């Protein structure tokens, strides 16, 4: 389907708006993927909050022109699907995970916060846990000293309680031995 000039301007404006708020863009070649698989990829992307779209490369180049993602323009050749995300790892994770199960989807390049990424860097970015998981891990690490301190206090209290009973029991025995000695 051919787009007229107004349609092209609308597409560039839409993509430019997405790119302006994005942290990560991942570009993948989708040559030979069946429509059903592409639909599954779109559903996974939608669930993760990732904007996924097949675009004309010239329109995509115009959309990233003058942004931190301009370095991707040199990689925009061939049939590409663009994955754009506000989350740092979501776009890379969706594309990378899907490419593991479908060898026809090939990660070509990416860009994170203005830094160009090659295929290996996109895969490494995809292996980073999500923001929520990282926050949970940090919180868990912060709670470890508190939990250790609490267990230490409980053990100390238990030890003192055990130590107090034998001393209290030994005191009447000592009194009885003193009374017997007199």
UniProtKB/Swiss-Prot annotation:
One of its GO terms (biological process) is translation. GO terms for molecular function: large ribosomal subunit rRNA binding; structural constituent of ribosome. The keyword rRNA-binding applies. GO terms for cellular component: large ribosomal subunit. SUPFAM superfamilies: Ribosomal protein L10-like. The keyword RNA-binding applies. Belongs to the universal ribosomal protein uL10 family. Part of the ribosomal stalk of the 50S ribosomal subunit. The N-terminus interacts with L11 and the large rRNA to form the base of the stalk. The C-terminus forms an elongated spine to which L12 dimers bind in a sequential fashion forming a multimeric L10(L12)X complex. Forms part of the ribosomal stalk, playing a central role in the interaction of the ribosome with GTP-bound translation factors. This is Large ribosomal subunit protein uL10. The lineage of its organism: Bacteria, Pseudomonadati, Pseudomonadota, Betaproteobacteria, Burkholderiales.
């Amino acid at each position: 389907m051919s787009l007229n000039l107004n349609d092209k301007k609308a597409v560039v404006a839409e993509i430019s708006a997405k790119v302006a708020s994005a942290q990560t863009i991942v570009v993948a070649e989708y040559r030979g993927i069946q429509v059903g698989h592409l639909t599954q990829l779109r559903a996974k992307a939608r669930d993760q909050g990732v904007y996924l779209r097949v675009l004309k490369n010239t329109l995509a180049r115009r959309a990233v022109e003058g942004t931190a993602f301009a370095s991707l323009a040199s990689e925009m050749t061939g049939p590409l699907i663009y994955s754009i995300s506000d989350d740092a790892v979501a776009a890379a994770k969706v594309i990378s995970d899907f490419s593991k199960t479908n060898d026809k989807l090939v990660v070509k390049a990416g860009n994170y916060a203005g830094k160009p990424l090659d295929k290996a860097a996109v895969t490494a970015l995809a292996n980073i846990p999500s923001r929520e998981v990282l926050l949970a891990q940090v919180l868990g690490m912060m709670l470890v000293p508190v939990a250790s301190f609490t267990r230490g206090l409980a053990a100390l209290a238990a030890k003192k309680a055990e130590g107090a009973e034998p001393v209290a029991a030994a005191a009447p025995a000592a009194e009885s031995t003193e009374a017997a000695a007199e």
